[in-house]
A protein has these predicted regions:
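Structural beta-alpha unit
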Residues: 69-104, 111-112
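A conditional alpha-helix N-cap/helix-loop micro-motif detector
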Residues: 17, 56, 85, 114-115
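Charged helix-capping and loop-helix junction motifs
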Residues: 20-22, 53-56, 89-92, 118-122
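Helix-adjacent hinge/juxtasegments
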Residues: 49, 57-73
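Short beta-strands and strand-loop turn motifs
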Residues: 7-8, 37-39, 74-77, 104-108, ...
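Anion (oxyanion) recognition and catalysis
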Residues: 29, 68, 127
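Gly/Ser-rich helix-loop-strand patches that form or flank binding pockets
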Residues: 26, 95-137
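Small/aliphatic-rich secondary-structure junction motif
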Residues: 2-50, 72-73
């Protein structure tokens, strides 16, 4: 049913992603799918990496570690954006097509007052993606 599961990750904030990571791994095992972890970073130095090449290396290392932990096939893809905070949703939607995903599994957040003014990333991806999206809270 699914062959390529895209999982957006923020390497600077992995703890809140735990349930989504485990869910994606379970689905990948069930369907024999590959998990493609996608991270979006800036071209400028940040808390995770000093440059896009280092960020790509860290994404690959993260994917390899997840493959070992969960026993699934993985890939790590680093996307670069001039402003990841404001450009995250469009960049992730481009990644869906770029990696050939047929399912997105992503973490949600606890809803709060700001959701009335700014939509959540998961909600935006679910509304605009042409493939199935599972938002895990």
């Amino acid at each position: 049913m699914f062959t390529r599961i895209m999982v957006p990750v923020d390497l600077a904030h992995l703890e809140p992603l735990d349930r989504a990571l485990r869910c994606a791994a379970d689905l990948a095992k069930h369907y024999g799918a590959v998990i493609v972890y996608v991270g979006v970073g800036a071209a400028t130095p940040g808390s995770v990496a000093h440059n896009p090449q280092e960020f790509a290396q860290k994404m690959s290392e993260f994917a390899e570690a997840q493959a070992e932990v969960h026993g699934v096939s993985t890939e790590g893809v680093a996307m670069t954006s001039p402003d990841p905070t404001t450009d995250l949703d469009p960049t992730l939607l481009k990644a869906v097509d770029q990696v050939g995903a047929d399912l997105v599994v992503m973490a949600s957040h606890i809803p709060n007052l700001t959701d009335y003014f700014w939509p959540s990333n998961g909600g935006t991806i679910a509304a605009k993606a042409k493939i199935s999206v599972m938002v895990v809270r």
